Amino acid sequence: MTTPADVHEVRDPELPGRLLSVERDALLPLLRARGEGDFASPVAACPGWTVRDVLAHCSAALSRVVESRYDKDVFSPASNQRDIDERAGWTITEILDELDRGMAEAGPVIAKAGGPLDGVALGEWVHAGDVRVALGEPGAYAGAGLPFALALLAQVTSARGHLPLHADLDDADEPVRLGDVSGERPPARFIGDGPTLVRLYAGRPVDEVAYELAGADAAELNIFG
């Protein structure tokens, strides 16, 4: 019998699109209500980038997925910076419109890709959390998208053969199993809440947050480098 902890062993192709859709409904109204000056706020998780830069990166990445535009160094730091620079003359509204379209249209493309693009959807959701932190908004790495993000994180880490981890989450009814399921390495163990687990896997700071991690160092969990 398949349990919720085992679901990630079989890829759900619709999961990335669902995560993007939920986040689109939550994030875009928040951003459109913000003043122009807020988009110049620095984003601590992305040194050297402002909120505007992060959103330009996110909108560009989704447009590349929708349009199947993959340069040789696509999604590399250099490619990401070029995408941001190309949008330097855009208005905030234009960037948000591109992001809106991308979050609405990328899901089916990611689904058909078979798995390699699943991490793009997860990265978009993490960056939405980065933006919330920069703007002082509540709900960073949490909210309605968290259950979908955790399921996608399990799916992505399993596909990549990442180190195995068993997570007992304060805010979930069932444990979450992440990473390699071969059994070759004993799973690490995490006890804490979902947003903290996401922060660890995304390489975001978890200062002053109570959690337990045994069998692995926090740095080993980072899937974004």
For each feature predicted by the language model, list its residue ranges.
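Helix-loop segments that flank and shape redox-cofactor active sites
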Residues: 28-49, 108-115
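Structural signal for well-ordered, non-membrane alpha-helices
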Residues: 24, 28, 32, 62-66, ...
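Short, helix-capping/interhelical loops that line the mouth of catalytic, cofactor-
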Residues: 2-15, 59-111
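N-terminal capping/interface segment
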Residues: 1-37
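Hydrophobic packing residues in well-ordered alpha-helices of helical domains and bundles
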Residues: 16, 20, 92, 96-99, ...
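Structured surface interface patches that mediate subunit assembly and partner/cofactor docking
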Residues: 2-15, 41, 70-74, 112-225
